Structures are given as C-alpha cells and as structure tokens.
C-alpha cells in the first residue's frame, strides 16, 4: 500500500503539478510533504499527516515552513539516566 501511495504522489508531482504551477504556501510543498510522510511513517500515519497538511492549505492560512515531524527516539541506552546526561 505504501508503494502505491508513493507512486500516486509521484505521478501527481510529474503529471499534474507542472500544469498547476508552484502555488503551495508551504515549504516543502504539500506533495513533497506527503511523499516524505508516507515514506517515513508508512501508508496509514503518513496519509493521516498528509491529509492534516492538505487541510491547512487554504488562502486563510499563512503557510511557511512546515516539515514532516521527526520520529521520536523512545529507545533509552543503558548509560542514560533519567535526567539524560549519562552520569552514573
């Protein structure tokens, strides 16, 4: 499913977007955001993030830089303490 969605986004970028011009008020563009979100988080969560982004893409939103959120690293190493500084 992830591959199909990525192909659909890429098809939009190559086949439709060039005829519409660069009108996106965000950086990265909504299609680039969708491609990255689906690639990073998979079909379900990536599509959810892309849909959230598309819902913000309207004339009354100021736009700006809106990157795909980074995955949080919930893995703790054995040398890390509760405060995170690594002391024993």
Swiss-Prot record:
Keywords: Cell inner membrane, Cell membrane, Membrane
Coarse class of the protein's main subcellular location: membrane
InterPro entries membership: Membr_insert_effic_factor_YidD
Similarity-based family: Belongs to the UPF0161 family.
Record-given protein name: Putative membrane protein insertion efficiency factor
Region annotated Disordered, chain positions: 64-88
Bilayer topology annotation: Peripheral membrane protein
Cellular-component GO terms for this entry: plasma membrane
Pfam families the record matches: YidD
Free-text function comment from the UniProt entry: Could be involved in insertion of integral membrane proteins into the membrane.
Record localization: Cell inner membrane
């Amino acid at each position: 499913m992830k591959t199909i969605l990525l192909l659909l986004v890429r098809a939009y970028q190559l086949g439709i977007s060039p005829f519409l011009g660069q009108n996106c008020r965000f950086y990265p563009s909504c299609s680039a955001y969708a491609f990255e979100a689906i690639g990073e988080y998979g079909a379900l969560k990536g599509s959810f993030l892309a849909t959230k982004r598309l819902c913000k893409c309207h004339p009354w939103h100021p736009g700006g830089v809106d990157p795909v959120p980074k995955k949080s690293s919930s893995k703790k190493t054995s040398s890390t303490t509760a405060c995170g500084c690594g002391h024993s």
